[in-house]
């Protein structure tokens, strides 16, 4: 069965979309109508009628910096989760290095701390010294 037609997968994706911001009005409204919206989305996908919306655009002033925000509709977020969780993630995961934990399940902060410790021990065994460098990179405003 095509995952895009599977109501259970669509419902799961909608639940994940709600979890991103359960306190927001849009999420709460979606949750109240979750089953109905799942059925409607399933029908629209089957009949090739689904079209992403433009979303909402607004500006906020955060700590003195003006930010232009674009947000997607909950239905679009559901479709994004459906595609990412069931198609893209399984397709690219086999090609990622083990140490890449960016946004991957079960690869949080503790995973990276343990991996850092493993690499430090490997470095010490190889060079018999603690003298060396660690390069830390943080991408911002990209």
Name each region found by the language model.
Residues 41-65, 120-121:
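Reverse-transcriptase-like RNA-dependent polymerase core
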Residues 4-21, 53-57, 84-92, 124:
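Short, compositionally biased low-complexity segments
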Residues 27-31, 68-73, 77, 102, ...:
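Short, charged/polar micro-motifs that form catalytic or ligand-binding hotspots
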């Amino acid at each position: 069965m095509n995952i895009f037609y599977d109501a259970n997968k669509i419902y799961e994706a909608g639940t994940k979309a709600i979890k991103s911001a359960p306190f927001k009005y849009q999420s709460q409204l979606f949750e109240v109508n979750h089953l109905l919206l799942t059925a409607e989305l399933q029908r629209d996908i089957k009949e090739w009628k689904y079209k992403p919306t433009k979303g909402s655009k607004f500006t906020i002033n955060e700590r003195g910096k003006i930010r232009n925000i674009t947000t997607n509709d909950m239905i679009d977020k559901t479709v994004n989760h459906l595609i990412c969780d069931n198609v893209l993630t399984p397709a690219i995961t086999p090609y990622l290095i083990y140490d890449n934990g960016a946004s991957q399940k079960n690869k949080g902060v503790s995973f990276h701390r343990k991996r850092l410790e493993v690499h430090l021990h490997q470095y010490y065994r190889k060079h018999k010294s603690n003298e060396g460098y660690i390069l830390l990179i943080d991408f911002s405003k990209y």
